[in-house]
Amino acid sequence: MDDHAADLLAAVAEVARAAEAADGAAPLDEATWLALRHHPERVRSWVRAGGFALVIGADLSLVVHPQARGRGLGAGLLSSALAGLSAGMPLEAWSHGDHPAAAALARSHGFERARELWVMRRQMASALPQLRAPDGVTVRAFRADSGDAEEVLRVNAAAFAHHPEQGSMDATNLAERMAEPWFDPDGLLLATSAAADGGEQVLGFHWTKVHPGDAGAGAGPGVEVGEVYVVGIDPAAQGRGLGKVLTLAGLHHLAGRGVPEVLLYVESDNRPAIAVYAGLGFTHADDDTHVQYRR
């Protein structure tokens, strides 16, 4: 990482930490942090005292320090970013929390509300149902010294073929995530069955995550929070209840880690998934919603 990239990362981190402390939600997603750390050449940036705007591909991020809000800095950063991009370039921007100020800024610059992502949470003090896998299915942890990584990528690509963020994960993206401090191979659970050639095939996976106590996951400082990070099922194996089985297996793993709360993200219109998660004890608060705007 050269000096410019390091300075950008430091400036972004300082403002993001302050915004997270004030708002109770991290203002940048994991993909943005990974790009800043590993692929700074992909990041276009507009940095001012008290705030910044970033564009990575078609994704726009804009964050203003709490002490610099209400002075037009956000509008100025957004105008500068839009002026520096190709006319008519499609853009997507997330508001991590349904903030009225973000909605007003988006509307004033031609962005429309496009998606809502719910945060659902489960308090782990309540007992979990017993785990029962279907006949012929084994749930086990990821093994780094096997072909598991390739199988996870295969299932992920099939399961999220129509999902713009998750479906594009490749071997490099996977390796970057596995190099993160939070990665635990025991928390990446695979549902497998016997293959026709006598080997083993992966039917689906549940990748769990534990946020450190300072990660702003909403449980208070110093408190670790678990996450249902990704659940992916091979379309050829759907209809067997594997999504619920893998989700429950991950919850048992996170319970063993001692986290008091587990969160997950789900599209607000994915009623079947919401019903499954509600049946496992997850709830959603109206203000625990992330909103995507498009232009």
From Swiss-Prot:
Acetyl-CoA 1 binds at L62, V63, V64. InterPro entries: Acyl_CoA_acyltransferase (IPR016181), GNAT_dom (IPR000182), MshD_Acetyltransferase (IPR050276), Mycothiol_AcTrfase (IPR017813). Transmembrane segments: none annotated. Keywords: Acyltransferase, Repeat, Transferase. It is an enzyme of class 2 (transferase). Acetyl-CoA 2 binds at V231, G232, I233, Q238, G239, R240, G241, L242, G243, K244. It catalyses: 1D-myo-inositol 2-(L-cysteinylamino)-2-deoxy-alpha-D-glucopyranoside + acetyl-CoA = mycothiol + CoA + H(+). GO terms for molecular function: mycothiol synthase activity; protein-N-terminal-alanine acetyltransferase activity. PROSITE patterns: GNAT (PS51186). Its EC number is 2.3.1.189. Residues 137-295 form the N-acetyltransferase domain. GO terms for biological process: mycothiol biosynthetic process. 1D-myo-inositol 2-(L-cysteinylamino)-2-deoxy-alpha-D-glucopyranoside binds at E30, E165, K209, E227, Y265. Belongs to the acetyltransferase family. MshD subfamily. NCBIfam families: mycothiol_MshD (TIGR03448). Monomer. Catalyzes the transfer of acetyl from acetyl-CoA to desacetylmycothiol (Cys-GlcN-Ins) to form mycothiol. This is Mycothiol acetyltransferase. The gene is mshD.
